[in-house]
Amino acid sequence: MFALDSIVGKHINYALDKTQHLPNKINNSITNTEITLQDYQYFASRIFIGLKNLNSMLLFWDTGTGKTLTAVYIIKYIKELFPRWIILIFIKKSLYIDPWLNTISSYISDTSNIKFIYYDSTSSLDKKFNNIYRSIESSLNKKNRLLIIIDEVHKLISRSVKKDNNERNFTPIYRKLIKLANYENNKILCMSATPITNNIAEFNNLIGLLRPNVMNIKEEYINNGKLINFKEVRETLLGICSYKRLIEADSLTDTNYIDGYAKKSIFYHNIIMSDEQSKLYNMAERYDYKTELGGLKTMRRLISSFAFYDLKIKGDLDNVEYNEMIKRKLAEFSEFTKNINFSKAFINAFKNNEIKSKTDLLITDINNYNILYQYSCKYIEACRIILNSRGKVLLFEPLVNFEGISSLKYYFNCFNISYIEYSSKTIKMRDNDLNEYNNYENNDGNKIKVCIFSYAGSEGISFKCINDIIILDMPWNESELKQIIGRSIRLNSHEYLPINYRYVNVHFIISYSNNRKSVDKEMLDIIKNKQGKINVVFDLLKASSIETIHNMHKYIEPVDNEIIFEIIRKTRMKEMNISNVIINLKLYPITYCKDYDRATILKGFLNKDTNIIYDNDTPVAKLIVDNNNLPIFVIENDILIYITNDYY
């Protein structure tokens, strides 16, 4: 391993020698100021520019660490490697103006060779990219080279992974990208704080883009949190990424204040729905299980957020009828809340959870509160968290319409909570609102307390001086969760607050029906189960990074000429015969059932170390445990039956 490491280390030092004349500053022509690159930005840029045969690199850096500025620096100075480049940048459409166009315009005078493609826009992909592809394909010769930059590459990669063994619509474009990126002396730069979001298939597609045909990892290669053929895979990937993660803990782990990043503390709020909301939740559960989209848990997630009285589960209603019903219900709820304005005495009692113990509260306040709680235990808890926050609050609610942001805002009005909304419905005003929210005079939230944001604000947007963030609805993976939380914890995002206020409390509101069912808990478990294997891949990328190699061979003599990356790119890792790898697991026979189907009794074998249940060597379920980490079970007909979730 170390022989190949040292050769790559020699090439890294070769690149550093070759690019030592490059400045570590970049001039902003609009403000006439100079920005000094961070050491890691300068280092990665010089390696990528200095090595002709290192045609691909992943910037695996935390949110807020300057990936965009680094890419712009590379665009500006890559002419040191070759004078004429076509720059093709893949981004989300919402990030075109800020940060991309604003940053490029500030630092690069001639942008005529730069073209943008929106990978979340069908028209941009199908028409614009295909036209560009044809023109680039015909013009790639000794006069031009191509640099492809992909921002938030995980978003693009996830569109190329097969679903149910069927090709995704994006797959043909993915193949064209591979062809362009690996044509002679072209280069590709990918960027993401979370390059893998769901599974190992995404990792294989990412590597297929950066170094096609060199390897294929299978999920069974990962056992007990370790990659069985780690050495072979790492050697195949040496130098494939630059790694900068100041905080390596995942989104569900507390972190301390470090190097300009606010302290993070996790809080789980387990709350019980009203009887009315529980009733609708059970109806939604039956509806979800009957529909093709039941796996998305759609209706349960909607009802967990808000359940207005007499609200009908969609059932046989078509989309027009259902939407009309939703509009009527929202109008009714709006009319009901117009006259609710809680007294200061009630709000103080509510903040301190003293409503039941206070005897002098207005009966109208109590009645109105009970009705609001009946519709949404989540929104009530969110209001309590906000009122107890010392500063500004972010609230993530991906549901933009009736069951989400639209109804949530009425709750805020009742409790006199000031807010702005950053979502797909506020495109015209949201940037101005965000500027007011981030304004220095609002650092403590005295003017605007809350910013409600949906997926429209979960990437590429920065919020300043946030003290609390509330997650009302769980995303599907830790990557999205990291992006959401990353909006509030960025480099120096809290620098204008006193040191003791440089923290972010992350609140997860987990609602349970009165029979203890929770789609929020299901989603949280999915996130945790996915992340285990993804963390193995992240450790692999760290071990393969240019920083890890350089730290081991910092003072080694550089090579005279490039050779190694041309060889690595053309060497395929041998397939591993997993049947030859003997893994000893101690398993115990067990009787169990799934939590959502307690009528079906199953038999399997339990690994007590991991709580995973196997059937013919395949993991099929995982024990549900209580707060003391003890398994939950029932006894029927003198048989001990363990309660489990699906193994994801």
From Swiss-Prot:
One GO molecular function term of this record is: ribonucleoside triphosphate phosphatase activity
For this entry, list what GO says about its biological process: DNA-templated transcription
Q: What is its EC number?
A: 3.6.1.15
Please give the catalytic activity noted in the UniProt record. Answer: a ribonucleoside 5'-triphosphate + H2O = a ribonucleoside 5'-diphosphate + phosphate + H(+)
Motif (DEXH box) on chain? 151-154
Q: Which SMART domains match?
A: DEXDc, HELICc
Top-level lineage group? Viruses
Family matches, as InterPro entries: Helicase_ATP-bd, Helicase_C-like, NPHI_C, P-loop_NTPase, SNF2_N
Class of enzymatic activity (EC top level): hydrolase
Where is this gene product found? Virion
User: Which SUPFAM superfamilies has this protein been placed in?
Assistant: P-loop containing nucleoside triphosphate hydrolases
Write out the residues that bind ATP. Answer: W61, D62, T63, G64, T65, G66, K67, T68
In the UniProt record, does the keyword Transcription occur?
A: yes
Subunit notes for this chain? Monomer. Interacts (via C-terminus) with RAP94 (via N-terminus). Interacts with the cap-specific mRNA (nucleoside-2'-O-)-methyltransferase.
Which named protein is this?
Nucleoside triphosphatase I
